[in-house]
């Protein structure tokens, strides 16, 4: 089994307790400048990578190969790991991003005045920010539709062991067509989420598995700022001319557990290998992926029953087992992290079905 390039992008929430420091976007600007100008732990971008969304001086590469930058959509401080091929390296670089952020706060401010949160939801304003995953993939064009639909379905039921969990829920409020039409005069593509729909608390939800499920609107989308989707197939390639491209998983959440991070990325990598080998079929397709995402997230019975595209129904555990069985049959013994992932994947599904408390 070939080594796959992969990486994470983590958007951090910022809470400012000292009003004299200004707004959160001013604080993240201060910390970004402190990282590159004072500590000199990397090289800041001298030229704009994108006129509207990645202007010059917005961030840069760090000495460990990662990136620290201000995400223009929401003004979050974001850390991207270097691209790696091993799960332990990915987990280590993800934790390095957290330690780097704490170092910046301790050096430029104080933890009493400012705190950064490795979560994916803002309980005050209803905003959401993600932990995105990137994978280098090479899927033949004649099997792309089957592969991506199967991968999306996998990512939906993956929630049972990859969700970050949250108290409460949100409801999206749809904007009027007239409000949306008024945005058409803009020269730059700077349409924000708030221009399209609003969000309000959902008092009917006590707890759910996912922090972001309430905010996802599409299975796949190329315009991700207001069409939040599960995946964003990228046409760009930064590797070589062999046909690899970047699969951008938008629906991801920040896991504090390093084990959860390794498992969610590891299982996804195996499913992508199955897709590249043409081993995925439509028997795993979900009828309504976005609705199933919310259903799994909010199901306090832990049965997690979802509808299949063929008219049947299945539990999320058994749905995951369909992918696991393919991995056991075709990828066991292939080297790398495959055997560890397959073993832990099987154990976690057994525990989720038998007694979830064993996973605590």
Language model features by range: what are they?
Residues 1-118, 127, 149-162, 198-204, ...:
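Terminal catalytic/cofactor-binding subdomain
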